Amino acid sequence: MQVLSSDDLGFLKSVILEAGGMARRIQQGDFHPERKEDSSLVTLADLEVQRYLVERISGRFPGIGFIHEEAFDKNSAELKTNSLTAVIDPIDGTAVYSMMLPTWSISLGIFRGTRPLYGFVYSPGCGMLFHNDDENAYLNDRILKVDRNMRVDSETNVFIPGELFSSMHIRYRGKVRNFGSTALHACLVADNRRNRALAFYGQAYIWDWAGAYPVILKAGGQVRYLDGGEVDFAEALRNGCQLTGYAAAYSKDDFDYVRSIIEIIR
C-alpha cells in the first residue's frame, strides 16, 4: 500500500539534497567540533541539518513524529501505530566529517508504526543519493538490484565498524573496510553489482539504520541479526534506541556464509 505519493518522495529527496549542501558549506568553513556527554563528537552541521530537516518535514507532514540523534531523550522515543515518524541522523559519520573527509552521510527514514517504509541516504562528498519508493531502490535515480549470487574473491568488500576490529576474529579473503558512516556502509551493499560489497556488520542506533534499511530490502538485499533473528525496531526502542545486537546487511543469499565471516569474541 502506497503511504507517500511520488510528490512526497520528490519533496523529501529535494530536502535531503538541500541539507547536504548546507552541511558541505559548513564543512568547508571554520568550524570546531565539540564533545557530547558520551565523548562522541557533535558539530554545527549536526545541529543545523537536524533543525532544517525537522522544520521542512513537519511543514509538509503536519503531525509527523520525530526521532533524531541530537538533543533527544532516547527514553521518549515512540513509533506510534499507524502514524508516520521521521528518523533522522543529520550527520552519520561526524568523526570523518570533522576530519574534512567525504565519506559521511545524511540519513532519513520514514516509518509507519514500527515499519521502515522509505529511506534516503545522501553522501554529498561521494555524490551518492540512495533512496527507495514502493517498488524499487535507487542510487542517483538508477534502479538497484543486488546480485544474490555474487562471486566472493580477493576483491570482494565487507564493511565493519571500528569498535569491532579489536574484538573479533575474521575468516575472509577479501577486503575489510571502514569509511566511517553506518548508513553509507549499509547502502553500499545494495550496489554490489558495481562495488562488490558483500556485507556490512554493525550495531549502532535506530537513526543510523533508518535510511538504509528500506533501501537494502527494496534492492533485494537482507538485514538480520547475526544469530539469525529479524531486526525489531520496537525492541530497539526499548533498548535505548540501540539495536540489541550486531546485525548484517548483506547481498548474498547464503546467510550462513555471511555470518561465518566474523566471530565476535568480547
Roles of regions detected by a PLM:
Residues 47, 70, 90-93, 124, ...:
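Generic detector of well-ordered alpha-helical packing
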Residues 1-91:
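N-terminal subdomain of lithium-sensitive/metallo-dependent phosphomonoesterases centered on the IMPase/IPPase/PAP
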Residues 69, 122, 200:
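Conserved residues at the C-terminal ends of beta-strands
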Residues 19, 23, 46, 57, ...:
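Residue-level signal for inorganic ion chemistry
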